[in-house]
């Protein structure tokens, strides 16, 4: 089929009718909409949380005397927790995006901060961080929805490119945050700093619409999702 389409008489490739969209031209529109900024911030903090978990948990495990295999086992267990995401999705759909996002950030904030307080009991601290991975997975499910549901349909292509910049920003913010924390605190302090950022996002998520993402039935029986 591929060769027929490429070598046949049909037009497999057509000339573009207009210039390619320029995401930079939409930065002004992005900064003018607080809902987009909040949604993008949620994505950055979620990615930062995974960076802290994946990079610093194995290092901390070795320094805490848990051995050099615990880090790898923790990553494997965190990956296995992805099988719980269908249950998380069902839980979220029965409530609202706002409630799910706030629950994710609050749970991550508490568990990461608790891991710092339990640093002298490494196994308990590790269990707290693994619980934090569950909340990060919940944010993987719902954390991007506030941004995507706030974007106008006519701007989705350009704003998708703006949204994807969260990966690059978190890749800069995460090591910079760790560097600042390690100047004045032990390695476990990185988890506390991440928990503090999650707490800030929990407060910010309180400004989302209470019924964001909640399905409602119209007079004609149609199901509409609140944006």
Spell out what each predicted region is.
Residues 8-41, 221-227:
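Juxtamembrane intracellular "pre-TM" segments in multi-pass secondary transporters
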Residues 99-114:
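Structural signature of the two symmetry-related core transmembrane helices
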Residues 1-14, 201-209:
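C-terminal membrane-cytosol helix-exit motif in multi-pass small-molecule transporters
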Residues 180-198:
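A membrane-interface helix-boundary motif in multi-pass transporters
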Residues 84-97, 182:
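Helix-to-loop junctions at the C-terminal end of transmembrane segments
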Residues 35-74:
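Helix-loop boundary and gating motifs at the non-cytosolic
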Residues 138-151:
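Intracellular juxtamembrane helix-capping segments at the cytosolic ends
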Residues 156-183:
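A late C-terminal transmembrane helix in Major Facilitator Superfamily
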